[in-house]
Each structure stands twice: as structure tokens, then as C-alpha cells.
From Swiss-Prot:
GO terms for biological process: DNA replication; DNA synthesis involved in DNA repair; double-strand break repair; SOS response. InterPro entries: DNA-binding_RecF, DNA-binding_RecF_CS, P-loop_NTPase, RecF/RecN/SMC_N, RecF_2. It comes from Mycobacterium sp. (strain JLS). The keyword Hydrolase does not apply. GO terms for cellular component: cytoplasm. Belongs to the RecF family. SUPFAM superfamilies: P-loop containing nucleoside triphosphate hydrolases. ATP binds at residues 30-37. GO terms for molecular function: ATP binding; single-stranded DNA binding. It is found in: Cytoplasm. This is DNA replication and repair protein RecF.
Amino acid sequence: MFVRHLTLTDFRSWARADLELEPGRTVFVGPNGFGKTNLVEALWYSATLGSHRVASDAPLIRAGAPRAVVSTIVVNEGRELAVDLEITTGRANKARLNRSPVRSPREVLGVLRAVLFAPEDLALVRGDPGERRRYLDELATTRRPSIAGVRADYDRVIRQRTALLKSAAGARYRGDRSVLETLDVWDGHLAAHGALLMAARADLVHHLAPEVEKAYQLLAPGSRPAAIRYRTSIDAEDDVSAEYYEAALLDAMTRRRDAELERGVCLVGPHRDDLELRLGDQMAKGYASHGESWSMALSLRLAAYELLRTDGSDPVLLLDDVFAELDAARRRALAEVAASAEQVLVTAAVAEDIPADWDARRIVIRMQDDDDGRVSMVES
């Protein structure tokens, strides 16, 4: 799989970008702040419908523009697919597949399969559980695009049930049973949708765990073994069915209802879960050194890459300024993996950040002042 063409309109610092890409290695070179990371971000957005840098879509639209458009042409085993994504503030985003509108942008998920390495990856180890949940959900969706719908349904249920919990506390003291009966209904919705999401995550971690262990040994041979485990808010067993999770969620919500009503929040469900990262007998978060944390973060990404490869065609590798963050051993390990990828797209502040033996096409990025303000450009 590779991206043959990338077109941007009013995306971040790019008023317009029109790039012909090719298999192999391509390096976008330019000083920090010149917009090279925005190219990688656009490709990641096309693959996941999300940014690796911000939680909302609004910052992706260039200042003063009404909308941003990301267009890609992806080649997979000789077949071309064109994806157009239109991002608009305050309105639902639109998508086209092969120039035809689709009902939901989620319908283009799976066209571009990518794995992104970025400086922000350190948050996978040192950050909040939400970072690790997002990692799991993005990877699960890349493997099975239907998971995006499961996640959207679950998020909708959480919003509705949280609003109901906030209003139910007062109704309870007034003796109004109708609100509590409605809460029972939403308990069922949360259990049904939450169980599907938890089962998808658990299945993913089951297949991911051995790849993480192998990747960590590649990056840090002779060190403590790395291990991962899906830790749920209901202390469920590993590798169980959606039916088990559904029953366990219903039981946990029954037991914790008083606490939920008192606090007005959902205390049970996959939005409270975590991906447990361990080095030897210690948790990585709080105990891993800076180097160990980087090795664990890279292991998660390398494992994702290997898992996607076994599922089908090679995913596109996106390396956002990561070589500058790594020591020599980790740079060699990452370069070794990248050597076998069908397409690798890399950003670097200076060419010296790239392995010296890489045969890579270089595209120089610069900034220019014009009628659109200060915008990113490709040096001709």
C-alpha cells in the first residue's frame, strides 16, 4: 500500500499542497514550524479521522479559511482509491470515496492503513490512560473499520447516561421513579455497546502482546521483558467474550449506582479502562527511565506495524521527526523496520537526522508570505 497523491486545501499552514508521492522513502525536510509535520498529520487524519496533535478538528483549518480539505489517492495491490475529506468548523465533516459522497466519513476508514511514530508517543507510556485507550481504539479501527461505529455509539450512550445521572440524583430524593427506570434502560445500552468495545480491545491486546515483547527485545536486548495487559474497570478476566463483558458491566453498574448518582458521572465502562504496560515486575509509568519509556513507546508502534502487516498489505509508515529523539541503537532498530516497508514518509528538521545510508527522495519545505498570509510551500 502507498499514497500516490496528496492534495491539501487550507489545512493548517498549507493554503495549497499538491504532492505526487511514490513507494519507497520520502523525507520532508525543513526547519521546525515550517509545516512539514502538517503533511504527516493530514495523512494520519485521512487514515484515522483524527489528529495525533489535537483533540478537535478546528485547529486543522487554516486561520481565516472556512474549511480544510484533505485528498489522497491510495494504491493497494494495483487498485486506486481516492478519498476526499472536508473539515468544517461547527458542521459535520463530509467525505467522498472515488469522487462520490458517502453518508459518513467513517465509510472511508480502512482505505489508508498507516502507523505513525511521533514525539508525542512518549505520552503512551507517561500520559493518562486516555492516551493508551486512543492507541488501542485507533489500531482496532484500522484493523476493523466497523469498530469506529461501535466507539461512536458508545460515546453517544456515555453522554446521554451522564446527563441522566446528573438529573437523576434530585429525582431520586423526590421519589420520582421514572428517571431511575430510564436509567435502567441506558444501563442496558452502555453494557451492550461497551461490551463490544471491550471485547475488541481485549482481542487486539491478545494479538498485540507477543509483538510488543519481541519489539522491545529488538530495541533493548538483554533488558527486562516488556508486557502489556488490558485492565478493565470491572476487573474482568483476560480474553473473554462480549457476552461476559455485558453481564459484568450490568452487575458493576448495579453495585455502583449509588456512587454514580452521588457524583453524577459514569464510573463503569471502557472509558475507564487502561492498557497496562510493564517492564519486568514494575509498571512502566512512573518507574521506567527516559530511555526505557521511549523503547516501550516505540515497541507499541512497531507491534502495531507488524500486526497490520500480518493482516494484509504493508501499512504506510509515517515518521514525524522521531530520529532526532532517539539514540543510535533505537535509530538503527527503527531504520531496520522501515527498510522493509513499501512506503515510508519522514519529516526531519535537517537532513543529518536521517540515517546516512538511506536512499530517500527529499522534498524541501519552506515558508512564504503571500496574499493568504504566511503559508507553507514546497521548494521547487
